[in-house]
Amino acid sequence: MLSERHELNKIALLELKKDVEETREFSSYFSKMADLLLYVNEIYDTKERTLEQLKQWNRIWYEEISQEQYAHSFGNPEFCTEKFGKEYGQIFAFLYAEMRSGFIYAIEGRLFDLVINNELFLEISNLFLSGEEHPQKIKHIVFDHMRDYSEDVFEYRIREQLDPELDFATKIVMESDLSDPDILYQYGEYISENEIDTLKFLNKLPQEEITAMAKTYVDGFHEGFIINNIDMSPKRSVNIRYTIGFEPVVREAVRLFSEIGLAPIIYRSGVSVLTRGLHKIGYVSSSPNPQYEYDHRYDQAIFFDNRFMKHKLECYHNAYEHYKDEAYVFAGPACMETFGEIPFLPENKEENLKLSKKQQELSVEFQIKASEIMNQYIKPEQRSFTIIAYPIPEIGDNFEEIFKEVRES
């Protein structure tokens, strides 16, 4: 059934390309968006992938929102608003950002997410093809889509955070030839010189130094149980959070965690408007453009209201109930963070979506209640936590010296 919907979506996108002039003054947007979705669908359909191909896809995909091209990108609310007016411009920029999550779905082979992404765009494009477009109609479609699929989306997201069987990233860490920096393109995340140079640097270190770094990290987590007198015997999994490029250390950490009975859970930070937060949680990479991410931090303003907040909490609770056994054996997060990034000073744009006062209150209420739900299933007094931080090459010419000082401290 999913494969049939996927094929129908590809046909519909090609039809849209043929009939795009019927969307009148919006034709440039819908033509571009159809191309974008056809591109990710083609990536999904390509089952045999070389590292060189993954690298090429990655560079093409992220180039469009790069700082050099962002001024004229449909992902830029300022540009979209200037071109299509505020009401349509904000919606189009939101939709563009949401469709960009399709690249990750294609790389990971997540057909369900790819299909529903395509279907959201096609339902909106049909309004314009039939001349029935109106901002409120589009917002209604977005609300219904997010509500209808949030149960599935949150169930998968909670599973990602609790189930070691979802091992997309774990396989990259454990099975790749880490001597080749191009393996980093397997993630689908933006790969900059930071990630490549970090991996190259770690590959030059003696194995005993890599092991020592991993041991410090793992021991810090393990000691949380010992110092706080927490029974670790029921625990079977640990969430490893890191910045791409640190795979040699992560691989060794996975081995050391396994020695104390913990399997790795490694998931990326959220990519859709339903799973993104203001802070990235999971494995991360450099941003292709921090301004783009800043511009879209409140995209949920399109549909977030009291009804949706309550539904989201219900979905969140149901997902934890579904994976309560996995939650019980979860030992906590082990975080490997970085420092030395070039400071980012955002530009506050009038055109960006913003939460209303009521939406802000609802967002705070959701965060509080979602934390309460999580703590019912993953009890704070029964889990550990550790955090360690290393510099990245962006810090400057003395990167290796600073790294050594941190390692030896």
What are these regions (language model features)?
Residues M1-S409:
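Active-site bordering "gate/hinge" segments
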